[in-house]
Structures are given as C-alpha cells and as structure tokens.
C-alpha cells in the first residue's frame, strides 16, 4: 500500500490555518477582509446627526437620479446600509441609478448630551435632513427606514404632512403595538411591563451597546448559535469566510450603539403603552401628530418570520394612514435579513430600486409588490408570526445545525480513520527500517554489497533500477555483482 503523505499534511495544514485565523479573530475581532467603505461626503454635521451623501456626483453634474434618504434605528449604527460594497444597500441603489443619502445619529454615549436625547429629537433631525437634501438636489425624497428607523420615517412624514416626500419605504417597522408584540407576549402584559420599564428603569438608566447586541441575538438564539458553529467549522477556510466576514463582524460587535434612556422611555410610553402610532395623538416637541396626515405612497417590507416587526403589527400602517396608498412586499426573512444578507441582496434591494423608479415614472411596478389589504379576522393572527411558522423556522434551523454538525463529525471521523489506517500500514513497513537505522552509529561498518544481497533475498523480482528501457531486478543485479 503506497503511503499518501497528504493524509498527514492536510490535517496539519488545516490545524495551522485554524490557529492562524483564530489568532487573527482574537487579536483584531475578525478576519481582515481588505474591504473599504463606499465613498461618501459629509454634507452636513450638527450635534444631532451627520448627513452622508454616497457616491456624490462631480462638479457640473446636474442630476444624480432619484433620491433615497435612509434612516437607521437607534440601537444600530448607520453603517448597516454599507456593510459591504457589493452587497450593501447604498451600493446596490447607486448601481440602479439612485442617489443614496444616509442620516447618521452617531453613538450617543460618545457625544456630549447624547444620552439625554429624546425620541422627538430624532424625528426633528430626520425632518431637518430632508430639508437639506431637498435644498441640494431639488428633488422629492424617498424616505427609507429599518425597524425603528421606519417608525421615524412614518412620524417625520406625519409631522411634515408628507411635504417634499415622494414615498416612504419601511423594513420590519411595527405600527400597531396591540396587534402583535415580539415573542408573542400578550398586549396587556407587554403594556404593563413597558410602563414599568419606562417609569422606573429607563428614566434612570440607558442601554449600552453590548446589551443591545446581546438582546438582539437572544431573540433568535438558534440562529445565533448556528452562525457561530458555522464560523468555527469553517475557520480553517479563509476564502469561505471572507464573503460574509463584514456582516458577521457588524452583527458581532461593530454594528451596535447605545440607546439613550429618555428616548427609550418615550418610545415605550407613546407607542407601546398607549399605541399612539395607531390611535394618533403622539407628540413631537409638544406638537400633536397623527399618521393619518401621511398622504404619500408607502411600501412596507414585511418579513414572514420576523419576530420583532411582526406582520400583523407592520400592517397596522394601513389603518393608521387611511389617506395613503399603502403597498406591501412580503419576503421570507427574519428581522435583520430584510436589509442585510443574501436575501436582501437578491430580493429586497432590487425590488426597492424598482419601486423608486416606478414612483418616478421610470419603470413598471415591481411584480412582487401588492396593495396592502385589510386582513379578515380569520386571516389576521393576533399573535403576529404564527406559532407553526416559528416552530417550523426554528426546527428547520435546528435540523440544519444538527445535520451540518453530524456531517462534519462524520467527515472528520472518516478522515481520521483513513489517516490512522495509512499510518498503521506505513508503520508496519517502515518501523523495522527505523529500528535498524537507530542501531547505526558513527563506528558501525556498512556494506553496500550486503544490503543488496539482503534486498535480493527479500524481493528478488523487485525493480532495482531502470536502464535503457529495461528493468533490472534486485536478484539480477546481486548476481552480476557477485560474479
């Protein structure tokens, strides 16, 4: 049996690559991808926010296309729109001929007075940013927001009565708190807990970035564990990890920012305890505002398995904004998967691009976008995401983890078994030689003739050497030497 040296070198190389990549992750927090952020300019910088314009046109360029202003939620950094150059929202929109802008609220714990910000401060900031973008571009703005950022979009549009807003695009943004609370909690219990937290906890404390990250991950622990197992399983294969490394680092650490206590308290009081997004009468700097003042078109992107912005709650915009044409785009994704990841790259952002172009009169309506309709009592799940969907989604993910782990363990066991067999076979053949070599010292006499005779006796018909196209056996060579 021929000894395959790769059966030894491959496991060693894999172990070395795992150690090298693991050390880099421990030292730098992740693998170095070499990717850079998309080019952008800071058009406006004030204490409350910085306004970014991505891929700003050069001097003399009159029009960069339809304008989209993107709003991030309080707990997540504005870089969520540009996690990767190829798969980030700003890059995809830019390639579709759209002019992307981003409002960046920054990290409140690193700014003077940042932890004293209120919800109204964020809404007013978005309104001010709209004024700046409209003044520079001269265009109506398509206002896009993810999760709580989408709630800011609704509230800002209501505050402005849709002035200079071409459309609103939201991703997993809840409106009707009573329709479906996260994790299926009863509305009454949720309201009581929210009121207690607003009055006795967040009036005194804020949420640090690490706590926001941990809370988000615990909403889907199975998926979190699966992601970490997949990362560890592929730690030896740098090329396989690099395409998703920026997204992994963003969710693992870089993407989270602190929440100011007053803003959380105001959010809980107005939109969870009193459900003001639906009933109306929420206040922005002591001014009463209602979503019924929204008159521009609305596109709500709904995640079928989103356990934070649940479908029933997201669809509350239909009742809250009766004067608006409300559309929905239903997609099989969880909360973060609506805007980042392979599903977002392949489905969400191409559809959003086509929506913007359709509202600008430059394209047809996206085929997957439909008018939102009022669900009948039998169709509307007051618990949000149906239990069957949650169980199926969880079992599917758990099964995938188990199968992957079993397959990996099986492959590792098979490789180990093969290596052990190869080593055992080779040991039987080579150990006697190694033992004999170990007996050789500097004073040991060695006879080449004797070695040839032993080899001829052991394998007389074995190939000793090849000369002039002819094989000479050990027996023939030994006989010729002896004569």
What is the predicted function of each stretch?
Residues 36-109:
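Short, surface-exposed "cap/lid" segments of acyl-processing enzymes
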Residues 294, 300-302, 306:
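Short beta-strand/loop motif that positions the catalytic acidic residue
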Residues 442-444, 449, 453, 461-483:
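Conserved AMP-binding/adenylate-forming core of the ANL superfamily
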Residues 296, 310-320:
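Short alpha-helix in the alpha/beta-hydrolase fold that links the catalytic acid
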Residues 144-153:
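Gly/Ala-rich beta-loop-alpha elbow adjacent to hydrolase catalytic centers
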Residues 328, 333-347:
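Catalytic histidine-centered segment of alpha/beta-hydrolase-like enzymes
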Residues 376-446:
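Flexible, non-catalytic linker and terminal segments flanking ANL/adenylate-forming cores
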Residues 1-11, 139, 152-262:
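Alpha/beta-hydrolase-fold enzymes
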């Amino acid at each position: 049996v021929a000894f395959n040296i790769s059966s030894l070198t491959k496991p060693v190389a894999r172990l070395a690559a795992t150690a090298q990549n693991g050390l880099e992750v421990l030292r730098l927090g992740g693998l170095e991808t070499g990717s850079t952020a998309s080019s952008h300019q800071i058009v406006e910088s004030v204490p409350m926010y910085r306004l970014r314009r991505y891929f700003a046109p050069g001097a003399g360029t009159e029009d960069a296309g339809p304008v989209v202003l993107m709003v991030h939620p309080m707990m997540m950094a504005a870089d969520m729109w540009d996690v990767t150059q190829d798969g980030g929202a700003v890059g995809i929109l830019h390639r579709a001929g759209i002019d992307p802008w981003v409002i960046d609220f920054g990290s409140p714990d690193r700014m003077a007075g940042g932890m004293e910000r209120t919800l109204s401060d964020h809404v007013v900031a978005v309104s001010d940013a709209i004024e700046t973008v409209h003044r520079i571009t001269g265009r109506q703005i398509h206002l896009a927001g993810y999760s709580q950022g989408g709630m800011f979009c609704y509230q800002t549009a209501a505050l402005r009565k849709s002035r200079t807003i071409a459309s609103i695009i939201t991703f997993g943004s809840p409106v009707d708190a009573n329709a479906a609370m996260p994790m299926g909690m009863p509305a009454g219990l949720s309201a009581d807990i929210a009121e207690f937290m607003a009055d006795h906890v967040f009036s005194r404390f804020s949420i640090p970035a690490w706590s926001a990250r941990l809370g988000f991950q615990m909403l889907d622990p199975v998926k979190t564990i699966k992601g970490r197992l997949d990362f560890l399983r592929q730690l030896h294969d740098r090329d396989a990890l690099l395409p998703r490394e920026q997204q992994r680092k963003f969710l693992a650490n870089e993407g989270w920012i602190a929440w100011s206590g007053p803003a959380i308290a105001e959010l809980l009081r107005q939109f969870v305890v009193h459900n003001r997004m639906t009933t109306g009468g929420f206040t922005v700097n002591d001014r009463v505002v209602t979503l019924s003042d929204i008159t521009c078109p609305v596109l709500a992107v709904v995640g079928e398995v989103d356990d934070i912005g649940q479908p029933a709650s997201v669809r509350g915009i239909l009742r809250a904004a009766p004067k608006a044409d409300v559309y929905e785009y239903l997609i099989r994704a969880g909360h973060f998967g609506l805007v980042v990841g392979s599903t977002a790259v392949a489905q969400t952002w191409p559809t959003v691009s086509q929506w913007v172009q359709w509202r600008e009169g430059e394209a047809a309506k996206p085929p997957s976008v439909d008018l939102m309709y009022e669900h009948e009592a039998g169709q509307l799940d007051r618990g949000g995401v149906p239990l069957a969907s949650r169980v199926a989604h969880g079992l599917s993910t758990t099964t995938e983890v188990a199968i992957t782990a079993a397959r990996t363990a099986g492959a590792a066991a098979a490789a180990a078994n093969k290596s052990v067999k190869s080593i055992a076979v080779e040991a039987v053949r080579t150990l006697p030689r190694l033992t004999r070599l170990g007996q050789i010292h500097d004073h040991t006499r060695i006879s080449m003739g004797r070695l040839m005779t032993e080899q001829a006796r052991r394998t007389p018909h074995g190939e000793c050497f090849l000369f002039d196209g002819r094989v000479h056996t050990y027996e023939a060579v030994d006989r010729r030497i002896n004569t």
